[in-house]
Amino acid sequence: MTNWLMSDGVRCMSRRGARLLMAIGCACGLACLLAGCGMIGLSGEKASWSQVTLTASDDMNNNSPLAVDVVLVSDDAMLARLAELPASKWFAGRADLLSTFPKSLRYRSWELVPGQRVDLSDDAFTGPRVVAAFVFANYPDPGAHRVRIQKFNGRLVVQLDSNSFSVADTK
């Protein structure tokens, strides 16, 4: 690369050097734009379970029907709110939460009877990326009755027992 000295003592670079500098600037700008994508709503991942199974034991909820919700959370503020919310408060306030924060969460609901099994297909939870997912079960006994789902792929199995439930994810 040849530098040229101008009459006022300022050095200027050759066309090749200028093109190199411009290419470096464009590459840095592109890197900044791509890094910004995570900041404008591309965080999280898609809920892509191959199957979701809800299984109620014969003595579930003291032999009574039970409401169950799978909740998908799209932002960190809603995640913080739901992470501490017991199921009783979720079921009492879910309509208000959804109407106030329609882009922050979505959910699917079922009411199962003892001994029932529900198999859901892989398209039951399609939609925007999520940062977290929870299962809430509306048992009448005190307690959180909330489980955070750790994986967003494979099979999801929710086992509902007499007064508690568990969530297992398998490949």
Identify the residue ranges that each predicted region occupies.
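Bacterial N-terminal signal peptides that target proteins for export
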Residues: 4-28
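N-terminal Sec signal peptide cleavage junction
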Residues: 36-37
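Glycine-rich, aromatic-bearing surface loops/beta-hairpins
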Residues: 41-43, 132, 140-171
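Contiguous beta-strand segments within globular domains
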Residues: 46-54
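Early exported N-terminus immediately downstream of N-terminal targeting peptides
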Residues: 54-88
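Tryptophan-paired
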Residues: 84-126
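Helix-rich interaction surfaces within compact, conserved domain-sized segments
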Residues: 118-140, 146
